[in-house]
């Protein structure tokens, strides 16, 4: 008689995704980040739920309610710091996951990849509205600056901004709706994650060699369940160390000052995980151009599958494109650094060069090198 996990309608779905899933035998630790992102999402939803029980979405009491959580709620300080630093780890895993996809050609599974890009955008939106909730100086001014970018939309821009604000400035209506969005989005993300997995399991995972692994697969459980659990332990250990030893390392000191519409902070900047996109936005001395570049910096990922010129899938055996990939990694690191710097010489020029290089790598250099490698191997 067949086991219950193979016959029960619900358990069968879980079984096919987590137990009997045929998995390439040679997937490396770079394939761990999908499950780590799942862990991050669950951790963020749980800590967020407990924070929402004590938080008040009102400009008069929002800042005080966060202070109350940290001072008076049992382990409130821990829950709040886990949630804030959990977001940083979420983005670390996200960027590594995307980097893995770019390196090993996972983007050729187009549906999985495009849903992944939508997921990235959703997580970024969620993090943005979440950052506004403590109602500190950087929360308020970050919300003002970023929502104001929509005024660059021709004709309807100003109307759009006032519609999002719910008034003529970032005020109580804005905070209330941002809290509603911040509560809602993670559940939309969870639904999208299921779609992401559904499409992935249509094709199966790729593997480091980039060649078909149909003849060489092993069951997901126990091999990769334990491998994933090991990843969970490392991630939770790192998160615990950051949260317990230096919880405010990645935050902005300005956010310990309650929001004041009359005083602008000297340097308005987002959390570290948005700095690369912020640097690209600032590198164009035109509002609409900057907004378009900001959108393009993420949406360019959707174009990557269309610009794949190589006859090989990944970069494992493509040394020239490898150099360009690591140039891209270095470029994003430089953009992240520039995004946190004031708008003055030489940072402006460095930011502009890094921004041009960012788009050139995706649109010109990597596709051209793929084509050149085909020629060198006489594969055309």
Swiss-Prot record:
It is found in: Mitochondrion inner membrane. Heme b b566 binds at residues 97, 196. Heme b b562 binds at residues 83, 182. It is a multi-pass membrane protein. Gene3D superfamilies: Cytochrome Bc1 Complex, Chain C. SUPFAM superfamilies: a domain/subunit of cytochrome bc1 complex (Ubiquinol-cytochrome c reductase), Transmembrane di-heme cytochromes. InterPro entries: Cyt_b/b6_C, Cyt_b/b6_C_sf, Cyt_b/b6_N, Cytb/b6-like_sf, Cytochrome_b, Cytochrome_b_C_euk/bac, Cytochrome_b_N_euk/bac, Di-haem_cyt_TM. Binds 2 heme b groups non-covalently. Heme 1 (or BL or b562) is low-potential and absorbs at about 562 nm, and heme 2 (or BH or b566) is high-potential and absorbs at about 566 nm. Component of the ubiquinol-cytochrome c reductase complex (complex III or cytochrome b-c1 complex) that is part of the mitochondrial respiratory chain. The b-c1 complex mediates electron transfer from ubiquinol to cytochrome c. Contributes to the generation of a proton gradient across the mitochondrial membrane that is then used for ATP synthesis. The cytochrome bc1 complex contains 3 respiratory subunits (MT-CYB, CYC1 and UQCRFS1), 2 core proteins (UQCRC1 and UQCRC2) and probably 6 low-molecular weight proteins. PANTHER family: CYTOCHROME B (PTHR19271:SF16). This is Cytochrome b. It comes from Allocyttus niger. The lineage of its organism: Eukaryota, Metazoa, Chordata, Craniata, Vertebrata. The gene is mt-cyb.
